[in-house]
Curated annotation (Swiss-Prot):
This is Pyridoxal 4-dehydrogenase. GO terms for biological process: vitamin B6 catabolic process. It comes from the Bacteria. GO terms for cellular component: cytosol. Its EC number is 1.1.1.107. The gene is pld1. The lineage of its organism: Bacteria, Bacillati, Actinomycetota, Actinomycetes, Micrococcales. It comes from Microbacterium luteolum. Optimum pH is 8.0 with pyridoxal as substrate (9.5 with L-fucose as substrate). It is an enzyme of class 1 (oxidoreductase).
Length: 342
């Protein structure tokens, strides 16, 4: 299988085609470090010049900044790209007649947005919250229609003991109904979830007719539980998948002995050992581990595209090289024979 970043693939039943490689925009919001307007523009242009025509954003990214940046770039292009953004968080502030709920405890793994806009996020998965989020994203992006909406970070990973409250807002409170109405009216082409846990997508399929979902970090060379437990269900229900987090927080893109982070924390010994064995086999076949990590999810028929998040034009170009690297079938056969993939 030889991949091209610009290759167009059908996105389930949405009628959309997305490039096999998509660009996530979270870093443009100042994730981990500030990003200037000039650097953000250069990064987006490099993605476009590389043939990428699928871009993902969210109100959360830079508290609205990323949607502004992305819309400003795409509105100037002669060719229409596919855009996905998210619902579930509103960007707001206190004002006369409105008092916001207390801010949730800060996640110690969240370094914040270093040059985001001066807003505060408030979770709202209800009918009115979803509709307002859609309206706000239309204005920030500058497009009257948005191709895809993902319900952002619903689930226990984000909400812990508040999960049931937010789940009820999404289900009984009309969040899914709002998304269904937007799809029926042609305001969006499809919707699904954008999350870090496949189990909540499985649960959501019992509540709504999802078209496409974004799953981060849960289908990779180091985590394949979803391949047996979830991907067949996605195929059966006709729901396409976009996979993000293919490097599992960096360990699969780092050189041997380099960064040892897995799922935003220090990698446990068994993950380090598995990664070292992957390095051994990659060296044998002269394949960069990062290239294998990027291409692996697309070997499954349920997956339409993968998303990358980068901080510079150089990183985009390097990712495209990895993505388009020729990998022999024997390499994958060896991984399978050693139980590293199924």
């Amino acid at each position: 299988m030889h991949l091209k970043a610009s290759e167009k693939r059908a996105l389930g039943r949405t009628g959309l085609t997305v490039t096999a490689l998509g660009l996530g925009t979270a870093p443009l919001g100042g994730l981990y470090a500030p990003v200037s307007r000039a650097d953000a523009d250069a990064l987006l242009e490099a993605g476009w010049d590389s043939g990428i025509r699928y871009f993902d954003s969210a109100p959360m990214y830079g508290y609205g900044r990323c949607e502004h940046l992305l819309g400003d770039m795409l509105r100037e292009k002669p060719e229409r790209a596919v855009i996905s953004t998210k619902v579930g968080r509103l960007m707001t502030n206190e004002r006369a007649g409105r008092t916001l709920p207390p801010a949730p405890p800060k996640n110690p793994l969240d370094s914040g947005w270093h040059n985001g806009l001066n807003f505060r996020e408030v979770f709202d998965y209800s009918y009115d919250g979803v509709m307002r989020s859609f309206d706000d994203s239309q204005q920030r992006l500058g497009f009257p229609e948005i191709d895809l909406l993902y319900v952002h970070d619903i689930g226990r990973v984000t909400h812990a003991d508040r999960h049931e409250f937010h789940w009820n807002a999404l289900t009984r409170g009309g969040g899914f109904r709002a998304l269904t109405e937007l799809r029926a009216a042609g305001n969006i082409k499809g919707f699904g979830l954008g999350v870090n846990e496949w189990q909540i997508i499985r649960d959501a399929l019992e509540e709504a007719d999802l078209d496409c979902s974004l799953l981060a970090g849960r289908y990779s060379l180091l985590d394949q539980v979803s391949e047996k437990e979830f991907l067949p269900l996605a195929q059966k229900r006709g729901m396409a998948l976009v996979i993000a987090g293919v490097f599992n927080s960096g360990i699969l893109a780092a050189p041997r002995g380099g960064e040892q982070k897995f799922d935003y924390a220090d990698a446990p010994a068994e993950i380090i050992a598995r990664t070292n064995r992957l390095h051994d086999i990659c060296d044998e076949y002269h394949v960069p581990l990062a290239a294998a990590a990027m291409q692996f999810p697309l070997r499954h028929e349920a997956v339409s595209s993968i998303l990358i998040g980068v901080r510079s034009p150089e990183q985009i170009r390097q990712n495209v090289v990895w993505f388009e690297q020729s990998i022999p079938d024997e390499f994958w056969t060896t991984l399978r024979s050693e139980g590293l993939i199924s």
